[in-house]
């Protein structure tokens, strides 16, 4: 499997800084991220910055609610990750990876299939004064056997990707790796086999959600 580790100096850092704005997720005010300007849809952001995004949806440009909830839970329950090897699966902006690093994880990897996302992860990690390894991989086939805990937020938007992610995450859980997920209850989220731990309400981006306020839940995924 080909892996590419990204660093914030990999040529896209300056364009990313110009295109994005620094903001803090509602549930994680202690974390700063480079995100799309408020009120700008993903499509509008992609069309405005084709040199950065290409044809891929810039999922990394939003602090999605499931990731916010899971990151908040990790920050409030640091013992879950302290001293452990953590993987942020489908990392996007790197919010979960950064939360794990801030909570004392021994080693953190942020995995995403979009090379721009992994560059963003590295940029955001540097901005928050934490170290993570950001890698571009095929997240539906990648191996995470060197992890103690896998974090995953908002992977259940699109049917094919959601089903592949669920199969892989359940397989990881079956191998003894703890899998913590966060989601707002989208249609492709498994309806069983999740031990819910907490829920959070937060303002939603009305361009991305169907209501002004959403409830996101965090839980352990069973095999």
Language-model-detected regions and their locations in the chain:
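S-adenosylmethionine-dependent methyltransferases
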Residues: 1-223
């Amino acid at each position: 499997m080909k892996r590419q580790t990204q660093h914030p100096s990999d040529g896209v850092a300056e364009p990313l800084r110009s295109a994005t704005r620094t903001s803090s997720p509602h549930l994680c005010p202690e974390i700063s991220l480079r995100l799309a300007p408020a009120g700008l849809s993903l499509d509008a952001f992609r069309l405005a910055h084709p040199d950065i995004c290409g044809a891929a949806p810039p999922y990394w440009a939003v602090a999605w609610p499931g990731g916010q909830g899971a990151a908040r839970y990790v920050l409030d329950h640091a013992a879950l990750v302290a001293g452990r090897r953590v993987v942020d699966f489908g990392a996007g902006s790197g919010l979960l990876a950064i939360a794990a690093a801030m909570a004392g994880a021994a080693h953190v990897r942020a995995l995403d299939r979009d090379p721009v996302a992994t560059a963003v992860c590295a940029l955001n990690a540097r901005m928050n004064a934490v170290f993570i390894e950001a890698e571009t991989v095929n997240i539906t086939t990648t191996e995470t056997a060197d992890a103690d805990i896998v974090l995953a937020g908002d992977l259940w938007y699109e049917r094919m990707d959601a089903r592949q992610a669920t199969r892989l995450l359940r397989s990881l859980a079956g191998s003894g790796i703890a899998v913590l997920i966060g989601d707002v209850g989208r249609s492709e989220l498994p309806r069983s086999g999740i031990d819910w731990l907490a829920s959070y309400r937060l303002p939603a981006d009305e361009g991305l959600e169907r209501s002004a306020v959403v409830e996101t839940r965090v839980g352990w995924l069973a095999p």
